[in-house]
């Protein structure tokens, strides 16, 4: 038997002071000696994906208590990337991932909690908690707040926007064809309920990946935040984590720990899922970071290999009119994993917090398996309510029938894949010797080869300016540098530049490359995570206006057509300059907190984690 971590504060004479304090929190005499389960919540009124989580912790706590554990809740911070987008607030988004991970470690280790239920949802909160879980390696179950419903259709100047979401609103704001009244109509429809934004953006991508990693329950990534069916996920999470405690502490079963579940094979399965569902490019950052925290030998080269073999089986907003509610109707993540499994594209030697093997997991939960349980079938009938609300569990609507069309439906089989390559591709070349990433699911294949002159800017703000003032021309490659983890600092998302290119009619006529990153809502020929970044001496810092940049997605190449000799001449000049590898004319306030992150941050190919050794 493995002693409970909390025993040092709950058992023996030396723990009298700690027990006195535990009693002051409401702990009962008969609870001392039981596993203390940290309910790691992230409720906030700042973020629609978290606004409904205030009372959810109580649901989990009740389930933990009934199962024999002692629940204790605390909260982490949560940044809304959409509200922080396009101004200095975005500098804080990626660094907040590290703050969240650290805060979870601080609370859990300071109070010797035995296990965790992580109630996350939005962009950096799930990754931050995932990093903490892999770092701490104690029993954990993830249960997110769930996706937002898609907005209802609106018609603006005869053009249908159906259904709507956050990206619809941002793109419409940059379109000359949309007047103020039309923009107001789109805005009012775009985000109708609580939950993580309704497309396959970063938040939903990461919540889906926790299913594939084996750390959350089936349906976690796709069951709507507003649906009553989601209550059972919270209850089951509380029950399950106590069972994991029993197996680890009582039976010394280390296979139930995060590092026993999220093995290299599980990480490979998660990235195979990511490729198949056309997930956000941010997932690569976060998966690489989580692997490092868990000491899993999984890097960008592994992702590159997977992307060559795994087809894209689903295109969801911003790459189609499908949204998470449609993914759910098609069977959610178990259906996607089922198609990958039938295609021989998954490692079978994996398990999860809820199942001892992959085959049993998919038999029970994949609606196309022919063996699906009634519970699973009922779950995937959960449909949107269509009513504006910030309340969880506010609808019990059901789809009349499920989407099982493997040829033309939301989730396709391997035979009917959108593309043979995965929805995410790693590009290398003299601009990105350590790698860059493109969401190939977001662009038509005829755009996979693009060559044009560079238009160089040194901040996201400058990029927005050249787009909105119509300075950039069709056929050009917009190069946005010094926006990497160190150079930004904070590796801003380029959602506004990509949305404004789309709204200006240049979404298919220009390319954008950056050492920054992209929102999960970005689309078009957008290449991010260029490594090394400019601030670390990357070639992206040497590109000049007019240099010819070539992009070849098929052959995974990203090159600037400048000789090695000329690049070396430019490098020598840069090194001899007064402020080498820094933006020349950028006016940006960088606080001490951000400077601290910048000094420790690695480039994107390492997950933009902090290097502290």
Swiss-Prot record:
The modification N6-carboxylysine is found at residue 124. Signal peptide: none annotated. Pfam families: ILV_EDD_C, ILVD_EDD_N. Mg(2+) binds at residues 81, 123-124, 493. It catalyses: (2R)-2,3-dihydroxy-3-methylbutanoate = 3-methyl-2-oxobutanoate + H2O; (2R,3R)-2,3-dihydroxy-3-methylpentanoate = (S)-3-methyl-2-oxopentanoate + H2O. Pathway: Amino-acid biosynthesis; L-isoleucine biosynthesis; L-isoleucine from 2-oxobutanoate: step 3/4; Amino-acid biosynthesis; L-valine biosynthesis; L-valine from pyruvate: step 3/4. Keywords: 2Fe-2S, Amino-acid biosynthesis, Branched-chain amino acid biosynthesis, Iron, Iron-sulfur, Lyase, Magnesium, Metal-binding. PROSITE patterns: ILVD_EDD_1, ILVD_EDD_2. GO terms for molecular function: 2 iron, 2 sulfur cluster binding; dihydroxy-acid dehydratase activity; magnesium ion binding. Its cofactor is [2Fe-2S] cluster; Mg(2+). The keyword Iron-sulfur applies. Its EC number is 4.2.1.9. [2Fe-2S] cluster binds at residues 122, 197. InterPro entries: Dihydro-acid_dehy_C, DihydroxyA_deHydtase, DiOHA_6PGluconate_deHydtase_CS, ILV_EDD_C, ILV_EDD_N, IlvD/EDD_N. The active site is at 519 (proton acceptor). One of its GO terms (cellular component) is cytosol. Binds 1 [2Fe-2S] cluster per subunit. This cluster acts as a Lewis acid cofactor. The keyword Transit peptide does not apply. PANTHER family: D-XYLONATE DEHYDRATASE, D-XYLONATE DEHYDRATASE YAGF-RELATED. Homodimer. Functions in the biosynthesis of branched-chain amino acids. Catalyzes the dehydration of (2R,3R)-2,3-dihydroxy-3-methylpentanoate (2,3-dihydroxy-3-methylvalerate) into 2-oxo-3-methylpentanoate (2-oxo-3-methylvalerate) and of (2R)-2,3-dihydroxy-3-methylbutanoate (2,3-dihydroxyisovalerate) into 2-oxo-3-methylbutanoate (2-oxoisovalerate), the penultimate precursor to L-isoleucine and L-valine, respectively. Belongs to the IlvD/Edd family. This is Dihydroxy-acid dehydratase. It comes from Corynebacterium glutamicum (strain ATCC 13032 / DSM 20300 / JCM 1318 / BCRC 11384 / CCUG 27702 / LMG 3730 / NBRC 12168 / NCIMB 10025 / NRRL B-2784 / 534). The gene is ilvD.
